[in-house]
């Protein structure tokens, strides 16, 4: 996994620029090594996912995505199959507005909009 992770590092770091400063690359490495996060590499992109257990649902959250959109979207069915095998009933994702159209084409619905107010 470390070779793939290093190869995917530029895409992960680029995606982290939009994460609001919640994580850095070393946090992703730690999460992957602990098994809390999952890496989905493609030749020209990757996803990082996490399973979130809510009181009523278990979902697979697409935490980070970067690289060529087509290759990322090509993994869609494989990610769903894996999520189902883990007992998840949905995929979730927060992202930039540019994700709206390609996700809609794959059956995703926009559920809400996130807002942030940072303070000291």
In which residue ranges do the predicted regions lie?
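Short amphipathic alpha-helix that is part of the acyltransferase structural core
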Residues: 1-23
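Generic recognition of cysteine residues
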Residues: 8, 46, 53, 88-89
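Active-site rim helix/loop that mediates acceptor-substrate recognition in acyltransferases
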Residues: 16-37
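Conserved donor-binding loop and adjoining core beta-sheet/short helix segment
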Residues: 33-70
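Short glycine-aromatic motifs
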Residues: 37, 105-108
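Short glycine/proline-enriched coil/turn segments at helix->beta-strand junctions
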Residues: 41-45, 85-88, 109
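Acyl-donor binding region in acyl/amide transferases
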Residues: 57-106
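Conserved catalytic-core motifs of GNAT/GCN5-like acyltransferases
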Residues: 94, 109-120
């Amino acid at each position: 996994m470390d070779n793939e992770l290093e190869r995917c590092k530029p895409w992960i770091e680029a995606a982290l620029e939009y994460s609001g400063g919640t994580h850095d690359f070393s946090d992703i490495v730690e999460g992957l090594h602990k098994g809390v996060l999952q890496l989905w590499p493609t030749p020209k992109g990757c996803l990082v996912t996490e399973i979130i257990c809510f009181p009523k649902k278990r979902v697979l959250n697409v935490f980070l995505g970067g690289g060529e959109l087509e290759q990322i979207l090509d993994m869609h069915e494989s990610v769903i199959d894996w999520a189902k095998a883990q007992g998840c009933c949905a995929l979730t994702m927060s992202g930039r507005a540019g994700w709206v159209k390609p996700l809609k084409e794959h059956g995703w619905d926009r559920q809400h909009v996130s807002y942030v107010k940072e303070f000291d």
